[in-house]
Design a protein with these regions (language model features):
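Flexible "arm" and connector segments at domain edges
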Residues: 1-172
């Protein structure tokens, strides 16, 4: 996979991935408790939801930046479920970035991820497709954040804190 400039190094992504596991164990145990194939389908639905948010543009109440951060968080959780070690991957812009509409890159990858999830039910090979689609989604996230010039790591910390506050009854 070709490389390009990114806002996050593979080591930083690996650290975020490990932190996401701890976050998920604390705040999303209902999802972590699902069978891995059901978890992947759940994440596929999230990706589809986020493509829809972005497609609605100004008709969507949630800001684009929040959707980008949410997509990254789900991508990290997805990588954990797929045993996809992001610290060993070159997360960069996909070559298809030259398309007129960059949303198509995300939609394409989300569609391929859905295809992988469907293959689970047919007992067909799905892991390589799911891993590549998740990789491409993460590339899209990095590029989208870079284009908007916002700090993903700070945004991730803020979003995780917001999500954790919903579980006021958990003592750390």
């Amino acid at each position: 996979m070709a490389g390009c400039k990114t806002m996050l190094s593979s080591l930083e992504l690996g650290k975020l991935q490990r932190e996401q596991h701890a976050h998920d164990m604390r705040n999303h145990f209902d999802i972590v408790s699902l069978h891995k194939t059901e978890r992947l389908k759940h994440y596929g639905l999230h990706f589809a939801k986020y493509v829809g948010r972005l497609a609605r543009e100004s008709a969507e109440a949630k800001p684009v930046e929040r959707t980008i951060v949410d997509t990254l968080l789900v991508g990290l959780s997805t990588a954990n479920t797929l045993h996809q070690d992001l610290s060993n991957e070159n997360i960069s812009s996909p070559s298809r970035l030259k398309q007129i509409d960059p949303l198509r890159i995300f939609a394409d990858a989300a569609g391929r991820f859905a295809d992988a999830c469907e293959k689970i039910d047919h007992l067909e090979e799905f892991l390589p497709i799911a891993r590549q689609a998740n990789h491409d989604i993460l590339c899209w996230v990095i590029t989208a954040a870079d284009e908007r010039k916002f700090d993903l790591q700070s945004a991730i910390r803020a979003r995780r804190s917001e999500l954790a506050s919903r579980h006021f009854y958990i003592e750390d």
